[in-house]
Amino acid sequence: MNIHEYQAKALLKSYGAPVAEGVAIFSADEAEAAAKKLPGPLYVVKSQIHAGGRGKGKFKELGPDAKGGVRLAKSVDEVVANAKDMLGNTLVTKQTGPAGKQVNRLYIEDGADIDRELYLSILVDRSVGQVAFVVSTEGGMDIEAVAEHTPEKIVTVAIDPEKGVTAENLKTLADALKLEGEARADAEKLFPILYKAFVEKDMSLLEVNPLIVMTNGRMRVLDAKVSFDGNALFRHEDVVALRDTTEEDDKEIEASKYDLAYVALDGNIGCMVNGAGLAMATMDIIKLYGAEPANFLDVGGGASKEKVTQAFKIITADPAVKGILVNIFGGIMKCDVIAEGVLAAVKEVGLKVPLVVRLEGTNVELGKKIINESGLNVISADDLDDAAQKIVAAVKGA
């Protein structure tokens, strides 16, 4: 689960991290009062959407010469003018895709005099099975580009969960960022604070880009992105309360109600699979044969007939879907239950696109018999390769 920048900063501030004063607003009428609460005279007006690249983004409605989604303002009047310009319009960034995201809230923040911009993130490093800091002196820019062109400028430091952030870790991180004086002292206080927040709140990513050294020598969290482990949300009611469903795909929200793992993609072949690994393999083979998956959908290992029906409804709710591939390996889940769920869904939604079903495992012969004797226009496949070729051919021939 993702949250907005202003929410992430409030959370980090509660742990003691140095962040600027700021006020979130939801209408342009609130802009003047918000700005007057801040010291000034420099302000930053930030679009709040769940996507990166806001500063370089462009508003659809304002034309190519308009300013981006993060703007400096040197007076309260400029803050108000920018708020009117930005709220309600659609911001397109490299992460939103061409559709963009509507800006429904802004964060008005006190400006800072920046000397250096650094990069810091905390994530789970699965290669070593530990939480790790990733830092770079190249902050304020695309860290992926840094990793590609100058990987030597990125330093990763894994943290032993039994010891926490040690003095040795602090020295390594501060040295990697070339910090001295007050900035180094600030950083050595900040790193354990961020680690504590990451672990206690079950985050999956905490990214500060940039982490800045100001001209007065002090450090500040200038931007913050936080993602949480969805499997741990049951023990964090305060985090769940921060969820903004307007930033999420409607189909993903619906899927979460039925405990379905669904992610919308840009292709035209809908997929319903049990097991994340099999789902990824299914998407890979669809791409191998020249098509694109419309979604990732894992119905899990013990899905009921009703759950399968709901999964089918979610897939068919996407107008981009021109064909559907169901790929099920029945272990805990029985193939006859899947077959009945698929057929019930086909009848209920009045399916108008090609459907290929590949079943294997428990009660597979009974499952195939149910499908073959249904009288419905369902294409049966013997294996995954056969299934992928059949659905791609059916979609391209439609």
From Swiss-Prot:
Q: Molecular function terms in GO for this entry?
A: ATP binding; magnesium ion binding; succinate-CoA ligase (ADP-forming) activity; succinate-CoA ligase (GDP-forming) activity
SUPFAM superfamilies according to UniProt: Glutathione synthetase ATP-binding domain-like (SSF56059), Succinyl-CoA synthetase domains (SSF52210)
Protein keywords: ATP-binding, Ligase, Magnesium, Metal-binding, Nucleotide-binding, Tricarboxylic acid cycle
Binding of substrate occurs at 274, 331-333
A GO biological-process term? tricarboxylic acid cycle
Pathway listed for it is: Carbohydrate metabolism; tricarboxylic acid cycle; succinate from succinyl-CoA (ligase route): step 1/1
- Tell me which residues bind ATP: 46, 53-55, 109, 112, 117
Q: Which reaction is catalysed here?
A: succinate + ATP + CoA = succinyl-CoA + ADP + phosphate; GTP + succinate + CoA = succinyl-CoA + GDP + phosphate
Cofactor dependence: Mg(2+)
Role noted for this protein: Succinyl-CoA synthetase functions in the citric acid cycle (TCA), coupling the hydrolysis of succinyl-CoA to the synthesis of either ATP or GTP and thus represents the only step of substrate-level phosphorylation in the TCA. The beta subunit provides nucleotide specificity of the enzyme and binds the substrate succinate, while the binding sites for coenzyme A and phosphate are found in the alpha subunit.
What name does UniProt use for this protein? Succinate--CoA ligase [ADP-forming] subunit beta
Q: Which organism is it from?
A: Rhizobium meliloti (strain 1021) (Ensifer meliloti)
Q: What's the name of its gene?
A: sucC
